Amino acid sequence: MRRQYHFRQVGQDIYIWDVHHLVELTKTFVIKKVALADIRELNEAYWFPNQSPTTQQIIEHFQLVEAADLSYPIILCAEGRVMDGMHRVAKASLLKHGDIFAVQFAQTPEPDFINVDEDELDYDE
């Protein structure tokens, strides 16, 4: 899996979770099915908040959606928000699935970083 991070605005701060770390934390979690209708991010500007994406950026996301493997569960925080797996959510929606496999934290873990510029994070595999 390519190195990636989950970013979330919390008050005035940006909380950042290392997705590899989230996957490790959830390895023993029970996998359940979640209705796509319950995934709020489908109706939000998830990948491009506060910006207008270029056509090339949209194409890159199409490619990631196409390559997404629905056999891997998405990761949800304690409140049911997506922390990992939005390309899988998009693929499931495009394929007209009613639900998707997911694991969910009972308590959302502390972020790995707070207010770190995304360009300063390690993206090497």
Where are these regions (language model features)?
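Glycine-rich short-loop/terminal segments
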Residues: 1-46
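N- and C-terminal low-complexity/disordered segments
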Residues: 2, 68, 121-123
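Residues that form or immediately flank small-molecule/cofactor binding pockets and catalytic motifs
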Residues: 79, 105-107
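Short alpha-helix boundary/capping and kink motifs at helix termini
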Residues: 28-81
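Short hydrophobic/aromatic-enriched beta-strand-loop microsegments
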Residues: 98-105
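Short, solvent-exposed coil/turn linker segments
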Residues: 33-38, 99, 115-124
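A sequence-level detector for short glycine-anchored, His/Arg-bearing signature motifs
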Residues: 79-95
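Amphipathic, charge-rich alpha-helical segments that serve as recognition/docking helices
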Residues: 50-56, 107-125
